[in-house]
């Protein structure tokens, strides 16, 4: 789904699509973002398990932390692990995990090395995903995440409908008249906005 007009890694229709597939009984739903960076970490708010895929030579541990991926990853994957730098990338990730504030009861994201072209490590990746699901279910983290996700989805729906209502209000003779009043200094923008908002409850 295109992300045009949305400042994030996921399109606005992602939540609805996930909910639809879930209602149809899909046992697993995979969502891929448009890249890896700060705007893509919002996937953590939509997924039960977040898998962060990096390549060898991806960058030092400081950059990994700045991207926010250390905070959202449930599983790390080093793809193209047959290339030079895979061991160094794993070491950087391990060091960042060691320096994080994870306690003994927290989930420690495993680091799995894969090579997609040969399917190497894929079974290990799937085992890591299943292990996280088991942990999240037993610890109550899965229920908590889904509750947070539902609240966020409801907020997004309300915001979207309010935006649609605002677009409807900001047209017509009344809008033009208030705009003229502001330009003529007969009122201020805040008072004009309050006047327009009187109709938003309809």
Placement of each model-derived feature along the sequence:
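Nucleotide-state-sensitive switch-loop elements of NTP-binding domains
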Residues: 1-39, 46-53, 61
């Amino acid at each position: 789904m295109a992300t045009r007009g949305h400042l994030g890694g996921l399109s606005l229709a992602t939540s609805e699509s996930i909910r639809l597939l879930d209602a149809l009984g899909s046992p697993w739903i995979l969502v891929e973002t448009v890249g890896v960076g700060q705007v893509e970490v919002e996937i953590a708010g939509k997924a039960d398990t977040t898998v962060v895929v990096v390549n060898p030579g991806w960058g030092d541990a400081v950059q990994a932390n700045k991207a926010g991926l250390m905070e959202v990853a449930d599983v790390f994957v080093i793809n193209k692990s047959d290339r030079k730098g895979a061991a160094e990338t794993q070491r950087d990730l391990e060091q960042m995990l060691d320096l994080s504030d994870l306690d003994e009861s927290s989930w420690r994201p495993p680091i799995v090395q894969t090579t997609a072209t040969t399917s190497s490590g894929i079974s290990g990746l799937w085992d890591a995903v299943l292990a996280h699901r088991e942990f999240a279910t037993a610890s109550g983290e899965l229920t908590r995440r889904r509750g947070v996700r539902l609240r966020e989805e409801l907020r997004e729906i309300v915001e979207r409908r309010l935006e649609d209502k605002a677009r409807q209000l900001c047209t017509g003779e009344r809008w033009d008249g208030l705009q003229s009043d502001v330009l003529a200094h007969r009122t201020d923008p805040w008072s004009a906005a309050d006047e327009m908002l009187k109709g938003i409850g309809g």
